[in-house]
């Protein structure tokens, strides 16, 4: 009987008293239970002892070479079992003995050697397992047979099979079984080790005995890839985090289990049946050749040879080929740099240069293809009308006949396109055959020189004609560049294959081969026909058979004269034949003229069909990316090939509209310029991607060069002006307009474009260059580390700092996550992307920097030391004032004050921002909606909001990791679901009206988002800190919101020197080139404050005083040691003057600056170790209470202002 699939079994615990686990939990599936009850009796002893790998005495069937017959890679199993660290060798030995006894009983014989070996194995394994906490058991699938068959197998074939266990991470195999040498059936067993890395059997199973995933293509697919859902490799957390207490089984080890990739493959296979995919010949080569060979081949190439001569005609063709070949190489490089989907030129450009260029080119390229349909159809209709005119069977008149025939033709072409790509491809093959026959007809005709054709200028291959036609003979104001402009549209069409990239079986291989080979073949044909027609036909001929020369002339200079024809009449009159006069030269030369007409029909219709297919496919890809939301309806596809039927209809209508005009002489140059603009950007994309040096730019096609691509882009731009300068300018204006529109709209896409790569490279290079620049006072910028916590929980703090750092200095939003490290790390990784997006969305030029620490002080230290890069490091710490310090735990207050000391220790400036209403709005549920409503109707008083009053307001500097403050709306817009949001649209708490305090808090939180009006910024520059106190208000006045505010400067001075001090300060400010409206010198700062204010201060600090004079010395010392923040009597007396100064300054602030928009004031400094935290906090409270917004600023006492140039 064949061994059945293995059942995962949980090894019993080695510690006495532990029972067997009920099952092991599987990811995404139900719990797995133990073996069938039929085997329980045979294996009870082994299981209860917790010993062997198999947990029973029945060995698996072997192959006689010491290898088990299973498991196969898809059948491998493993489970993780808790192993007691105290499990000794006795348990393992008992298990081995039980297993040996069971095996002996089943086989009917006793094998002491085997028992001994098994015992030794168990001892060794038990000691090894005792070293760790977990054991991984790999179970042989052969052991999962039914109970009856397993016993019989043990006695039969499998009796001598090996029992295999894995040790040391699964790399070394411990085998208990037959010898590697075939014996004479003595039954002797021995124990041996061998390395699985040198064993082919175990190499086959690599990757199935571990949670780690082996490299596979499914891990690198995009979620929206054609193959279905992306298969996720195990996350780092799954491999690295501590295991849960409950044993589990790795889902990746179970071969028979369904996986996302397997399901996706099945779904994709089912949906893919019948989908038409083309190879490189039918999909690219044929299309490109048909698109390149247009009407020019048959009705304009002979005229070009007549104007430019054979030599310059070859130069014209070669120049066009250079442009198209370089573009073909660039297209091949981009197409082989990753999986290419539908969208052709749009897809290539957008994924290389980004949505801005891609969106602009995609729209005009799709439009150009749609109008190109009309151009080719009108060319076809004109040829048909000429035939009708020759036979005098016009329906109405020439212009209306072109409209009627064109309309009928485009309807038929639409039917072929809508019928499906398969039918369209078949039509292309038929048209190519006709085109090739027409070319062959011309080549054959050049060797057939009929007497009737000589009067029309065709003499066959003659050296006289070749020599005469080799040089140029420009007429009617034609020049080399005008001739080149007429020919170049005949060389376009090289993107016809790339435009249907989504319908190619292997775009990466098909596009380079098909495009480059098509360019080569068509160029050879163009040059061959140019040389042939220039060697056979003279420039001018009368078509009159009577113009032959019967007598030999000795003074002949023209080739016709040497060939006995006199066409001198054409020198002074207009003739109807010859290269210069007859557009139907190829029909005249050919062996069968109607076949040339068929070739013209084939060339026009094939090009029209290719454009009719390309335009909707490009437009559909553009609409799928939602670059232009108004066109989203055209993204829908129908049928098995996802055909863009709506795009077909739109293309049909555009083409029909231009067909009805029937005059495309003005539109044609614009279309050619649209194509050339696409070529230019494709070439520039390769140059740009190579210049950015992105590791992701590694095309499989190696035959490209970034500088050649740049030359190609420049050549395309030059050719645009050569063809038509005003059309080139119009194209540039349209591309620029669309680029600006897409840039303004900022589509929510991220394609890893070279623009992003170059931005990174530029930032990296400039950062490295900046690191070598020494600091200079003239280049000082405030680079602020703002302790915001969650950035949107303190909007006033964020906006005020942003006002003086925007486009001037660095702003980093520091957020200290506290709590369990494991949870905090997960939240930090989520917050990093979430809050950075929030800052960008709210147009905040700032960086979000989360850090995990045990407490706020430690986290702030980490940020101050490590935040930033090179010279782009913070130099100023910005904090919100701790408004709730009187009710808070004084240990938190002590920690808050220590942030100041830490900042000063590492030479940081410190800025403390205080609003009397407070800064933190995170306790208000739905704050973002309220903020927007406040901006719209600030007078509203009856706002209803969910308020969580149970949450204690934390310090205005940081929040713990669990306190998030981002709305669910933002989460949905960002495309992520919050794991632990603070704010929700639907709160379970009671809905209560917003109280007055919170209403004022919300109003205050938005005050810096508005224009500040004509008011004052009062600068109390009491102490010289290097100039930071003066620099910040100046920077504020340079911003649009603050530009109407005037700076008033307050300084301290002596009563008898007020005028002198004012003049000295005015002189200094003028040297600093800082405008001010007034300077006020305060001579009464040192006056004793009002008695009631002193009493109020004493009452405030009373709960925090030590009162050591009223206590015993030991008790006082102990209390000071345990609570170092307490204010001692000695300290209070020592700093009485400084205390009075803070109280007095508050009185002066209320007197002079109560109406100011904002007050910027010198921050008092407390000596570390001398001033307690409670006293320092009391100073700040007394100084800044009941005032307009206050900035307490203290620089690091290094100059940040200078009056030297």
Swiss-Prot record:
Residues 1-102, 143-187, 953-986 are annotated as: Disordered. Belongs to the SLC12A transporter family. Its main location: membrane. Widely expressed. High expression found in the cochlea, cochlear lateral wall, and the choroid plexus. Lower expression found in the cerebellum and the cortex. Residues 389-398, 448-479, 535-591 are extracellular. Chloride 2 binds at residues 365, 493-494, 675, 679. Pfam families: AA_permease (PF00324), AA_permease_N (PF08403), SLC12 (PF03522). Keywords: Acetylation, Cell membrane, Chloride, Disulfide bond, Glycoprotein, Ion transport, Membrane, Metal-binding, Phosphoprotein, Potassium, Potassium transport, Sodium, Sodium transport, Symport, Transmembrane, Transmembrane helix, Transport. The keyword Disulfide bond applies. Changing residue 320 to V: Reduced potassium ion transmembrane transport. This is Solute carrier family 12 member 2. Cation-chloride cotransporter which mediates the electroneutral transport of chloride, potassium and/or sodium ions across the membrane. Plays a vital role in the regulation of ionic balance and cell volume. InterPro entries: AA-permease/SLC12A_dom, AA_permease_N, NKCC1, SLC12_C, SLC12A1/SLC12A2, SLC12A_fam. PANTHER family: SOLUTE CARRIER FAMILY 12 MEMBER 2 (PTHR11827:SF58), SOLUTE CARRIER FAMILY 12, CATION COTRANSPORTERS (PTHR11827).
């Amino acid at each position: 009987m064949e061994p059945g699939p293995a059942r995962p079994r949980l090894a019993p615990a080695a510690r006495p008293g532990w029972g067997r686990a009920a099952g092991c939990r599987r990811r995404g599936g139900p719990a797995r239970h133990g073996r069938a009850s039929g085997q329980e009796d045979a294996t009870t002893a082994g299981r209860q002892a917790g010993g062997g790998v198999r947990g029973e005495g029945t060995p698996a069937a072997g192959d006689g070479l010491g290898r088990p017959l299973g498991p196969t890679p898809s059948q491998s199993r493993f489970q993780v079992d808790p192993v007691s660290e105290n499990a000794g060798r006795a348990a393992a030995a008992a298990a081995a003995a039980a297993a040996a006894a069971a095996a002996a009983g089943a086989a009917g014989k006793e094998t002491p050697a085997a028992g001994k070996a098994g015992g030794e194995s168990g001892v060794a394994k038990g000691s090894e397992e005792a070293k760790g906490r977990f054991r991984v058991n790999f179970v042989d699938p052969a052991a999962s047979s039914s109970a009856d068959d397993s016993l019989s197998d043990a006695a039969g074939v499998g009796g001598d099979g090996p029992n295999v266990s894995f040790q040391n991470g699964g790399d070394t195999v411990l085998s208990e079984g037959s010898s590697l040498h075939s014996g004479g059936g003595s039954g002797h067993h021995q124990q041996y080790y061998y390395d699985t890395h040198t064993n082919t059997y175990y190499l086959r199973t690599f990757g199935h005995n571990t949670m780690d995933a082996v490299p596979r293509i499914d891990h690198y697919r995009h979620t929206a890839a054609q193959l279905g859902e992306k298969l996720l490799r195990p996350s780092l957390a799954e491999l690295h985090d501590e295991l849960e207490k409950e044993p589990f089984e790795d889902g990746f080890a179970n071969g028979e289990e369904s996986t996302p990739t397997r399901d996706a493959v099945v779904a994709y296979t089912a949906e893919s049946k019948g989908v038409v995919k083309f190879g490189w010949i039918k999909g690219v080569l044929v299309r490109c050749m048909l698109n390149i060979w247009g009407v020019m081949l048959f009705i304009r190439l002979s005229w070009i040879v007549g104007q430019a001569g054979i030599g310059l005609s070859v130069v014209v063709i070669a120049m066009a080929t250079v442009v198209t070949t370089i573009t073909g190489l660039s297209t091949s490089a981009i197409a082989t740099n990753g999986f290419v989907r539908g969208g052709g030129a749009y897809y290539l450009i957008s994924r290389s240069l980004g949505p801005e260029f891609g969106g602009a080119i995609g729209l005009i390229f799709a439009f150009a293809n749609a109008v190109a349909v009309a151009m080719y159809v009108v060319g076809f209709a004109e040829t048909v009308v000429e035939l009708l005119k020759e036979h005098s069977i016009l329906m109405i008149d020439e212009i209306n006949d072109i409209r009627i025939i064109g309309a009928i033709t485009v309807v038929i072409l639409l039917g072929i396109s809508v019928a499906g790509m398969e039918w369209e491809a078949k039509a292309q093959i038929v048209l190519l055959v006709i085109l090739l026959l027409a070319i062959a007809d011309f080549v054959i005709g050049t060797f057939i020189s009929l007497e009737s054709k000589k009067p029309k200028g065709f003499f066959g291959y003659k050296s006289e004609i070749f020599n005469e036609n080799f040089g140029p003979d420009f007429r009617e104001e034609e020049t080399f560049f005008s001739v080149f402009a007429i020919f170049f549209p005949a060389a376009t069409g090289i993107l016809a294959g790339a435009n249907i990239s989504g319908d190619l079986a292997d775009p990466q291989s098909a596009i380079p081969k098909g495009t480059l080979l098509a360019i080569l073949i068509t160029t050879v044909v163009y040059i061959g026909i140019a040389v042939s027609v220039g060697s056979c036909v003279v420039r001018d001929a009368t078509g009159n058979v009577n113009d032959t020369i019967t007598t030999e002339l000795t003074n002949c200079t023209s080739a016709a004269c040497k060939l006995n024809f006199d066409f001198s009449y054409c020198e002074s009159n207009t003739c109807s034949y010859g290269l210069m006069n007859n557009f139907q030269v190829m029909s005249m030369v050919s062996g069968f003229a109607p076949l040339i007409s068929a070739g013209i029909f084939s060339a026009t219709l094939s090009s029209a069909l290719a454009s009719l297919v390309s335009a909707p496919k490009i437009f559909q890809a553009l609409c799928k990316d939602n670059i232009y939301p108004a066109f989203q309806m055209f993204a829908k596809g129908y049928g098995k090939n996802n055909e863009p039927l709506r795009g077909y209809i739109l293309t049909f209508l555009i083409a029909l509209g231009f067909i009805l005009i029937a005059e495309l002489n003005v539109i044609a140059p614009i279309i050619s310029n649209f194509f050339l603009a696409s070529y230019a950007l494709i070439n520039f994309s390769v140059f740009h991607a190579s210049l950015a040096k992105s590791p992701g730019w590694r095309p499989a096609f190696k035959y490209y060069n970034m500088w050649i691509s740049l030359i190609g882009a420049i050549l395309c731009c030059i050719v645009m002006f050569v063809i038509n300068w005003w059309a080139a300018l119009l194209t540039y204006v349209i591309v620029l307009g669309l680029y600006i529109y897409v840039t303004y709209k900022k589509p929510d896409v991220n394609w890893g474009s070279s623009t992003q790569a170059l931005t990174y490279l530029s930032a990296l290079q400039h950062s490295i260059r900046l690191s070598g620049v020494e600091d200079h006072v003239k280049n000082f910028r405030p680079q602020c580390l703002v302790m915001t916590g969650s950035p949107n929980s303190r909007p006033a703090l964020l906006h005020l700092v942003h006002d003086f750092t925007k486009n001037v200095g660095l702003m980093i939003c520091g957020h200290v996550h506290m709590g369990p490290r494991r949870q905090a790390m997960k939240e930090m990784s989520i917050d990093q992307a979430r809050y950075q997006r929030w800052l960008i969305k709210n147009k905040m030029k700032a960086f979000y920097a989360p850090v995990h620490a045990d407490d706020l002080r430690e986290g702030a230290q980490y940020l101050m030391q490590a935040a930033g890069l090179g010279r782009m490091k913070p130099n100023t710490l910005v904090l919100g004032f701790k408004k709730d310090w009187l009710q808070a735990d004084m240990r938190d207050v002590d920690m808050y004050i220590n942030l100041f000391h830490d900042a000063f220790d590492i030479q940081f400036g410190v800025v403390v921002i205080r609003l009397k209403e407070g800064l933190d709005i995170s306790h208000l549920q739905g704050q973002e909606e309220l903020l927007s409503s406040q901006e719209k109707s600030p007078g509203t008083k009856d706002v209803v909001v969910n308020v969580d009053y149970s949450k204690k307001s934390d310090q205005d500097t940081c929040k713990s990791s669990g306190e998030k403050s981002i709305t669910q709306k933002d989460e949905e817009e960002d495309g992520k679901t919050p794991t632990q949001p603070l704010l929700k649209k639907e709160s379970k708490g009671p809905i209560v009206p917003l109280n007055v305090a919170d209403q004022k808090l919300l109003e205050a939180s938005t005050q810096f988002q508005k224009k500040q009006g004509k008011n004052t910024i009062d600068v109390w520059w009491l102490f010289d800190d290097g100039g930071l106190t003066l620099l910040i208000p100046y920077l504020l006045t340079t911003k649009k919101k603050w530009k109407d505010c005037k700076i008033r400067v307050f300084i301290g001075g002596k009563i008898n020197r007020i005028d002198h001090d004012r003049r000295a300060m005015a002189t200094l400010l003028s040297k600093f080139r800082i405008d001010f409206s007034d300077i006020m010198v305060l001579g009464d700062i040192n006056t004793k404050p009002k008695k009631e204010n002193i009493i109020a201060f004493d009452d405030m600090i009373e709960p925090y005083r030590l009162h050591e004079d009223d206590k015993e010395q030991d008790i006082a010392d102990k209390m000071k040691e345990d609570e170092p923040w307490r204010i001692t009597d000695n300290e209070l007396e020592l700093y009485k003057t400084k205390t009075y100064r803070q109280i007095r300054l508050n009185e002066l602030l209320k007197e002079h600056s109560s109406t100011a928009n904002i007050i910027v004031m010198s921050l008092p400094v407390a000596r570390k170790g001398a001033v307690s935290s409670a006293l320092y906090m009391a100073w700040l409270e007394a100084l800044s209470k009941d005032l307009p917004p206050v900035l307490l600023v203290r620089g690091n006492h290094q100059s940040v202002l200078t009056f030297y140039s």
